[in-house]
Amino acid sequence: MRRPRRPGGLGGSGGLRLLLCLLLLSSRPGGCSAVSAHGCLFDRRLCSHLEVCIQDGLFGQCQVGVGQARPLLQVTSPVLQRLQGVLRQLMSQGLSWHDDLTQYVISQEMERIPRLRPPEPRPRDRSGLAPKRPGPAGELLLQDIPTGSAPAAQHRLPQPPVGKGGAGASSSLSPLQAELLPPLLEHLLLPPQPPHPSLSYEPALLQPYLFHQFGSRDGSRVSEGSPGMVSVGPLPKAEAPALFSRTASKGIFGDHPGHSYGDLPGPSPAQLFQDSGLLYLAQELPAPSRARVPRLPEQGSSSRAEDSPEGYEKEGLGDRGEKPASPAVQPDAALQRLAAVLAGYGVELRQLTPEQLSTLLTLLQLLPKGAGRNPGGVVNVGADIKKTMEGPVEGRDTAELPARTSPMPGHPTASPTSSEVQQVPSPVSSEPPKAARPPVTPVLLEKKSPLGQSQPTVAGQPSARPAAEEYGYIVTDQKPLSLAAGVKLLEILAEHVHMSSGSFINISVVGPALTFRIRHNEQNLSLADVTQQAGLVKSELEAQTGLQILQTGVGQREEAAAVLPQTAHSTSPMRSVLLTLVALAGVAGLLVALAVALCVRQHARQQDKERLAALGPEGAHGDTTFEYQDLCRQHMATKSLFNRAEGPPEPSRVSSVSSQFSDAAQASPSSHSSTPSWCEEPAQANMDISTGHMILAYMEDHLRNRDRLAKEWQALCAYQAEPNTCATAQGEGNIKKNRHPDFLPYDHARIKLKVESSPSRSDYINASPIIEHDPRMPAYIATQGPLSHTIADFWQMVWESGCTVIVMLTPLVEDGVKQCDRYWPDEGASLYHVYEVNLVSEHIWCEDFLVRSFYLKNVQTQETRTLTQFHFLSWPAEGTPASTRPLLDFRRKVNKCYRGRSCPIIVHCSDGAGRTGTYILIDMVLNRMAKGVKEIDIAATLEHVRDQRPGLVRSKDQFEFALTAVAEEVNAILKALPQ
């Protein structure tokens, strides 16, 4: 069987096909074409237009005509298991029903299955159709025993033997017979049911566990509602096997050896049922309820005709030689009774053909009196079955459980649609369907009341209320309980009670409860027995399944569901308390989270306010501020006109790269004022290209040679300035004015304040002048961040030195540590000793730095000046900026604003050493390069500035950062030069 699949998917080459045809010729007359195709129930295209699909009990077989009787297959569980294996191999090879190899293998397997010959049809006289009284009906029933095989493929079983005598048998119907006869009438009067759900190869024939899942003893019944099936064809109808299976036949006709069922002449009740069923199916009744039943096109009637046993079409009433009696010949009482029965089904007498009317009258005489008039009795199951047919059709789309358990065909009274009603509640009728298991021998039938109490009822007598089904239930602690866990629990329970797992039917799960019913079993165990045993072996079941069994019992399904709220209600107080506590905890947690979020937001706002205070357009202050600004502008305008009359001042000896290569040496209005310029374009430098490339190559080599850089830094650390005394800074009155005790100004290089103007009557401030080349004019003033008690000294230094630019390289607070005190007003104006500082504007240039403008006024002399503060924010205390680009842009802004006036630039950080020294070193080197100096020695320049203030450029990283910044600025200048 394991052959390579050819591209066409037909399973072999032409040579193999010819060889198989020769093998068929050697074994069968007629060659390959004479072999009937198997599998037409799954693929209708196998049969030609001259052939029909005949039910053979398994797959269906194509045959020309339907008159030829075919042997019946005795299908058992081992046979199905073997066929499953064969089909698996065929499907694994990619073969289909159309392949010759598949047909050959299936035909060989079919030859191995045992066969049963159907009885030869005998001529029947008209007496078999004549209506008889209820008394002799039993006599007719025992005389006319021969029956055809059941129309369902799953029950090709030997027909039961008949009693010894025909006319001498029992003359009255037993209670069991009286209860089993109404389904015959039900099958005739109710409209044809829709085709069964489609079947797939995988679940139907390729799953060995279906026998255990659905409990079919002969392994021939598959689920009618299994989910996930692939449609390959309709199933045969299963109404007749439920009525004429081996158990039902023995119950009705008895088990009497000695006579074959084909020995007695005349029509049997089974034959009447089949013939009348064919007549009814041949002509659809225009009943109102027929429109509710969906039918597939071209399958509603053809499937029933094809699924019925062979020969029934030709063995109808027409073959008996005589026409049935007309309605006029029938007794009036019988017609009235038949009309009353038909009225309950929505059918009128005039809608029936004479053949149908005669057959129904014959069957009606077999019914006990009052059976058709009592819609709620035990015997009359027509109303319940009708509800089961209408319920699932109308409510199928509203509620459908994931898995459904089909009723077993061997059960005598199981309705084909009862499982659907049990699993899918119908919105039309909430009354449970009737599928009760009747006892075989007793005359009294048990009728279940809605309260679960048993009430004995004589068969055939009307009852006051309809019967209700009983279910066994097992309540567990798992909610919801999965269907797989429930089935596993029942399998283990079946082992403990020595039953087959197939004895459990109508299995369903309702929350944590498992409900089920049991079919007739060899142990004769009832639902009460099984649930009682489940309670006895509770510990074993819990150990094997891992579930905790809370309760077991027997009752209606509503009772099993009613147990659930009681269990929940017992724990509801504790659960409500727990839920209340959880809710309170959640609300409290939410409130705490909101409070924390508000605090964090407020703290962030406060930090932003400290960092970027008084944001807004220029002049966004009070009325006093506006008046003061107008006064300052008028004063500055007057001073500007006076300076223009005197002539331009001398150019400064200290200039930046940007100021050196600007368009023109524009004079500032005052030597103590600055004119802000926000041009971002890099200045065009007149640097020699060869010199610039030489300097750039030197700097890059300097940075790549790590050993050289390390040795150079070690030499800088060992350098000692001479002289290096700091006695004044360490004096008793001045030591409190130092922010850091290790970074103090030298005695020979420090800024001295005027004592008469100082509030502390001291000339000391922690600040050092940094001279570039002219000792009389320092280019920078390096100082620490002002303390709260040295702010007045700081503004005195700004006023006396004539500074117009302040470079601040530290935030006020960093990592919770104060780096510098705010020495300018938060908004408006503030007075520090005799110096009034007015914040004019604050402009956030980018995320790395911002610019502030101030008016500085000496209240003693009433003089005013303008100055600009450049505040760089992205330089950590012990490290370096992430990139040199922001600092170089910041430096360009500072030099654009400075305009080269004859005043130093005040540079400060926190301690006035690390960041301050790095900025001064970068700016000084670049200024020298802009002046045309071709020899650049950064280490020597650093030693030069350290001679004037100790500790400038505190770390090796800061020194390397200065080298990198210089190299990048040189590269930028070279790119800006014209090529």
From Swiss-Prot:
Q: List the disulfide bonds.
A: C53-C62
Compositional bias of kind Basic and acidic residues? 112-127, 304-323
* One Gene Ontology term, aspect cellular component: plasma membrane
Membrane-protein topology? Single-pass type I membrane protein
Q: Give residues where Phosphoserine occurs.
A: S308
Q: Which GO terms label this protein's molecular function in UniProt?
A: spectrin binding; transcription factor binding; ubiquitin-like protein ligase binding
Q: Which UniProt keywords apply?
A: Cell membrane, Cell projection, Cytoplasmic vesicle, Diabetes mellitus, Disulfide bond, Endosome, Glycoprotein, Isopeptide bond, Membrane, Nucleus, Phosphoprotein, Receptor, Signal, Synapse, Transcription, Transcription regulation, Transmembrane, Transmembrane helix, Ubl conjugation
Tissue-wise expression:
Expression is restricted to neuroendocrine cells. Found in pancreas, brain and pituitary.
Q: Where is this region: RESP18 homology domain?
A: 35-131
Marked site, Cleavage, at K448, S449
Q: Where in the cell is it found?
A: Membrane; Cytoplasmic vesicle, Secretory vesicle membrane; Perikaryon; Cell projection, Axon
Q: What is the effect of changing N506A?
A: Reduces N-glycosylation
Keyword check for Signal: yes
Give the chief site where it resides: membrane
**Pfam families attached here?**
Receptor_IA-2, RESP18, Y_phosphatase
Ranges annotated as biased composition (Low complexity) = 415-433, 652-677
List the PROSITE patterns.
TYR_PHOSPHATASE_1 (PS00383), TYR_PHOSPHATASE_2 (PS50056), TYR_PHOSPHATASE_PTP (PS50055)
Where do we see the Glycyl lysine isopeptide (Lys-Gly) (interchain with G-Cter in SUMO) cross-link in this protein?
Answer: K754
InterPro entries referenced in this protein's UniProt entry, alphabetically: IA-2/IA-2_beta, Prot-tyrosine_phosphatase-like, PTP_cat, Receptor_IA-2_dom, Receptor_IA-2_ectodomain_sf, RESP18_dom, Tyr_Pase_AS, Tyr_Pase_cat
The similarity annotation says: Belongs to the protein-tyrosine phosphatase family. Receptor class 8 subfamily.
- What is said about the domains? The RESP18 homology domain is sufficient for targeting proICA512 to secretory granules.
Q: Mind telling me what this protein is named?
A: Receptor-type tyrosine-protein phosphatase-like N
